[in-house]
Amino acid sequence: MNKYATSASSLRVLVWLTWFIVLLSAITVSGVEATTSSTAPLLGVVCHNTDKWGALFPWQVRHRWKKWAVHRYRKWREANRRAKRTAQMARLALRGVLTLAQVVDWLTASQLHYKMGALPVLYALLQTLEVEQIINRHCRTRSEVGHGTVAVVLILNRLLLPLPLYQIADWVGQTCLVATLGLEAEKFNDDRLARTLDAIYPHLDTLWQQIMEQALVKAQIDLSVIFYDVTAFIAHGRYAESECIKFGFAHNTPSNKRKLKLGLNATADGNLPWLYRHMSGATTDQATVQENLQNLATWLHRQGYACQDSIIVGDRAMMNAKIALQYKAHGLRHLTGLKASTREQKRLLTQWSDEQFEGFPIGDDPTSQYWGRGGQLTFTHAGQSVTLKALVVVAGPLRDQWRRTRQERLAALDAELAELRSRIGQPRLRTPKNVQRSVNARLKASKVAEFVDANVYMTAEGALNLVWQTNSQALAAAERYDGRYLLVTNDWTRSHQQMFRLYREKDGVEKCFLVSKSDLRVSPLFLHKDQRIAAMLFINMVALLAYTLLQRQIQQQGLQMTTRQLIQRLDHLALIETRCPDGSRLLRLTPIDSDLTAILQLVADALDEMMWVVVGSDRYPRGLFCASLGSAPRLLC
């Protein structure tokens, strides 16, 4: 049968001839000079039915069967060789020529080591708090990686190994997060992280409220006692256009550094961070109290609770006459330290001698060196007055330390003046003016100069002399203040012992600040946009919430460890992935001892208690009270 006896074959020959003519025409026309300076483009549509007329370019192979056949042949040959080698290795192993380790090594194409540590525990906690779901709900994106996923990675990094944004991708690639999230480490580059910070910034208040409320409800946190304090985080750089990074005063921070301030409320139950607000570094501590009181009152009213069910504990920088009236206006109870600044306050602080305090111990142990006596203080501002219950506390250890330090400084000053007197008559110390100048320099450099009276004079024989003595009256007046401080409250039902014990617990919020600056490394700040600084501060606050919440839950299970100690205990855990030549993979954990197994079981029990608590639409059941300190009710959320 003639293979060209079909219409398709005839058409194929016709197509070949057509293309030959086109090619010949192109060669002919290329040697002829164009007769017009411009040519108009020819517009048209070429239609070709491949199924009916055949291929438009018949010299191209429609099916690359040769390449496919070669590929299949090579795969078959490789599999055949591998099977032969496997059989040969098996025979050698059975004969004892090869060890099992050599066989396993031959069957292993590669091995990968992923850092795991405390990642499963912390990731499960964040999933229990629904951090990823809440952020994705408010910050939608069409990207393959949601903003909630990126935020969770940032939070985990702050908890385990705080790094700059540009190093996050490398860190993810070394951990088991790649397998857990099913995403490549390159997805978490610094540009994507910055976009996430920009995306969550408009929703920071809403996101924090919902995440924080998840923790309060699922862990049943007691909100009857709230601690409030302010801290500062140092920033590096110029920040010329920043509204937050400013110069200002803050304790234990250098005055020549720009800083960002944070006002934080923390629960006495577990020291969990609650409501917070970041402010300019130039903001004074007392200026933050008014807005904080408004935020607290608004939140409590929104949840249907009376403000007087909670008591706010603050340090002495958080109280003056105006603030005392604001507490009264909002109906909030408070217990705060007070710096004696008025004549009435100083008179109350020094009213009793040390001997008169010894009959009024306020510590839990009667032998403890803490004493207190009560009184009243009236605060007046803008024509309004409020009277508060006051407690003068004498801390014996603090008093003894202050007096011991003062005596050491007096002894050092006495030695300096004696050394100066021994050099009188030497060059530059031959006139009363020069000697007095040297005395003044030493007094100015000493912190106890107010207790020493020094005199330079000429003797009857015409010799220079220097004498000094301790001002016993000034020293006795100063010792009257040693180890003493004032506490004031508008809760008249609390005893002196309850006031003292509750105020000593206020270091809970200071522990939050310590964790933020040491473990989470919030400071120093390197971001230069206020929006990203605020968003990164939110990431750190969620990390702090997870840190303190996990610590509270495991300690309630009887595991007396901090979260940092737990992370260090789990640090050696790793995931080993073995890849075989046939494409199969084997995942296994590094060996776990019995003690670590027991720890993980307690941690799992702690997380299970929260996992099964469902947060309803109303979030908080009303009327949930139990006894707390004294007669004050305990509020459970």
What do these predicted ranges mean?
Residues 5, 29-30, 35-148:
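Conserved glycine(s) in the ABC-transporter nucleotide-binding domain "signature"
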Residues 17-25, 31-33, 603, 607, ...:
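N-terminal regions of proteins, emphasizing targeting and processing segments when present
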